[in-house]
């Protein structure tokens, strides 16, 4: 059985174009393993749009996010931190999942 991950629809085009190559998640989604292939769907309607391969899963604190992380998310560092705070309010311990579209 294939494992799945969802993304907000606003990220779909960046993932498909290879502009978004990481996702930052909380501990509940830190269990993915390098080499694992995931089905990717939109969070809002659960419509499948591609597969990704997990390359790495690395812990990071909110204040440890860098311009490099922001580039991999296809946004500025300020935008990235704001999005993370909206999705995970009050959470500081996160995980960077690096992936490649298949």
Curated annotation (Swiss-Prot):
Q: Which residues form the active site?
A: 20, 23, 73
- The ASCH domain sits at 6-93
**What start and end residues bound the annotated signal peptide?**
none
Give the matching Gene3D superfamilies: Hypothetical protein (2.30.130.30)
**Per its record, what are the GO molecular function terms?**
hydrolase activity, acting on carbon-nitrogen (but not peptide) bonds, in linear amidines; N4-acetylcytidine amidohydrolase activity
**Keywords, alphabetical:** Hydrolase
The UniProt record lists the EC number as 3.5.1.135
- Any one annotated GO CC term: cytosol
One Pfam annotation, family name?
ASCH
Q: Which InterPro entries match?
A: AC4CH, ASCH_domain, PUA-like_sf
The reactions it catalyses are:
N(4)-acetylcytidine + H2O = cytidine + acetate + H(+); N(4)-acetyl-2'-deoxycytidine + H2O = 2'-deoxycytidine + acetate + H(+); N(4)-acetylcytosine + H2O = cytosine + acetate + H(+)
Q: Which PANTHER family match?
A: UCP029143 FAMILY PROTEIN
Instruction: Describe the task this protein carries out.
Output: Catalyzes the hydrolysis of N(4)-acetylcytidine (ac4C).
Family matches, as NCBIfam families? PRK04980.1
Q: Which family does it belong to?
A: Belongs to the N(4)-acetylcytidine amidohydrolase family.
Q: Please give the name of this protein.
A: N(4)-acetylcytidine amidohydrolase
Cite the source lineage. Answer: Bacteria, Pseudomonadati, Pseudomonadota, Gammaproteobacteria, Enterobacterales
């Amino acid at each position: 059985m294939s494992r799945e991950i969802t993304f907000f629809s606003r990220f779909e085009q960046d993932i498909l174009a290879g502009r978004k190559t990481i996702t930052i998640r909380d501990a509940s989604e830190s269990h993915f393993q390098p080499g694992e292939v995931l089905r990717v769907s939109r969070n809002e309607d659960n419509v499948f749009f591609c597969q990704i391969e997990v390359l790495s899963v690395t812990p990071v604190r909110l204040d440890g996010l860098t311009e490099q992380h922001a580039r991999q998310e296809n946004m500025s560092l300020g935008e990235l931190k704001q999005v993370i705070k909206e999705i995970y309010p009050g959470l500081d311990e996160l995980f960077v999942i690096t992936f490649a579209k298949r």
